[in-house]
Amino acid sequence: VLEPDLKLGRGGLRDANVLGWLELLDPELLERDRAVYDAAVRVLLDARVALHRRFTRPSDVLLLQEQDGVAADLGYPDADDLMAAVAGAARAVEWLTDDAFDRLDRGGRRWRRNRTRRLGNGVVLRGGQIQLDEPVAAEDTAAAVQLLDIALAAAHSGLRIGRATLETFAAAGRTFPEPWPSEIKDRFVELLRSGRPMIPVVETLDHWGLMVRIIPEWAPCRSRPQRNAYHRFTVDRHLCEAAANAAGLVARVDRPDLLVAGALLHDIGKGYPPRDHTEVGVEIVEDLAPRLGFDAADTVVLVDMVRHHLLLPDVATRRDLSDRGTIDGVARQVGSVPTLRLLQALTEADSMATGPAAWGEWKAALVRELADKTAHVLAGGSIEDAVSSQFPTVDHRRLMAESRRSVHGEGFTLTVVDHDRPGLFSKVAGVVALNGLDVLAAAAFSDEDGMALCEFRVEPSNPDADAIDWVRVADDVERALDGRLAVRARLAERARTYVRRRPLQARPWAPFDNKVIFDNETSANATVVEVRAHDAIGLLHRITSTMAELDLDIRSAKVQTLGDHVVDAFYVRDQSGGKIDDEEYLAEISRALGAVLRA
């Protein structure tokens, strides 16, 4: 959890108190877990006391902006180490609490105690638990098969693994052979394919130190925080969530085994900062996949899944999907339709595991469009057919041929036609922001007769807002284009009001750097200007106003909000209608946009 409640959160101090109260009923309840329990409670108490010392009022929620200070007060190297310790402590308390209630519950169900159902390979269902009914095998392969059979039985039944069985395996110290034979690999893949029931099983194995015996590279990912407003899980839990989501998508791909394995491993490089997690992940999986029993060809695919796991979502949300350079570039990187479909499913599984802001109908449609166009090219189809643009449409051209202004809003789309002039795009963008709307994507077009077209795909900033009042929006656009609406001044007023009414939403301390990036490779006839910045009211208006001042022609735009920041991409041309390759001009654009982002 990004901002854990140290007292009332799952695995927090209240749960620890409950364990203490249960111990009054059963003095032997924590006898074997005393060291783990005491260490976990100490971490949580220390963090809570340090947090209270920093607040003038009681607070048990360890907010993101307080984590660096609390970490320093407690002597942690940084906030990541603090949050990893807190997450690990909470998991320990959570597991101990669940185990305690399970033992007490089973103690009151005498009818279950002596019922035994044999599941094979020494695995039994007894007393409502999955247990091993024979010694751990002396040979590593046989012991690994036993452990995975137990894990599979727990996932399939939804029952807990018996504590004695876990203690036995933990004490046995068996390691997994290298490379894995098929009987181990197949069982592990089956465990991943069991979906959500797999998650508590993996977390149980991890609690007992068994997950790192299965995959040693898992260790640095354990309880590792992802300290941004976009992710809701630690790295290890995120990987499990992604694999569980992928299990529900296996019907879409030719190789379900590669999909779930790739989902489990796609972010494993995040356990090894400060290097780029994708680069590290590629190196890890190049070595790890063969050890897990995947042959050379499958290893190449798994490595490609790690290398390109952000390719589809990044391109779909930041690049023009009607530009042949976009589709050609993705096709060249992916290489085949089967790999493309694996990446498409991985994108969905990964995004859903990230958080509610990371996946929705709009993003899903963009990824699907990109994947389908790329698949068409990879299957031998014409790239011209794949990127045949539907913008401007026949209706758009008919409106432009009338040589008069037209402002129309319907559904989630605002379409504006007017005589071409500098700043038209930015004025409309400003009106959109004034009306409490977020821009998801935008496109612009100018014809030889001096008419301009702008189309904005929008959604309300407030998800609970009523339907868009298009009459009001259209009236504001008309006034702005006539010079009768002070767009910039009104946006400044709205920004001040927004900050006063929603102070907790402004998070300037979030770890994110403003950047302006130029891409002259993706498109054959436009320069892509990518702007990464903290979100703010009217930001799109200020950026595009600055571009207009520099005589940049905006052909299309992709706008994406990621938690508290945005990644906007603009396809722009110079006055002659070409790409911008003059270094001095690019530097001036960067200087101007940098000033906007710092304001």
Q: Predicted segments — roles?
A:
Residues 1-229:
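Non-catalytic interface/linker regions that flank or bridge core catalytic/transmembrane domains
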Residues 117-135, 157, 207-273, 510-514, ...:
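Active-site-adjacent "gating/activation" loops or surface patches in catalytic cores
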Residues 16, 47, 205, 242, ...:
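His-Asp-centered metal-binding catalytic motifs of divalent-metal-dependent phosphohydrolases/nucleases
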Residues 175-185, 189, 246, 289, ...:
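Conserved catalytic alpha/beta cores of large enzymes that bind or transform nucleotide phosphates
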Residues 55, 62, 69-72, 76, ...:
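Non-catalytic interaction/regulatory segments
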Residues 44, 178-180, 228-229, 288, ...:
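Short low-complexity, flexible loop/linker segments enriched in glycine and/or proline
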Residues 8-15, 35-43, 85, 197, ...:
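Secondary-structure capping and boundary motifs in well-ordered enzyme cores
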Residues 26, 213, 248-257, 271-276, ...:
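Secondary-structure transition/capping motifs at alpha-helix termini
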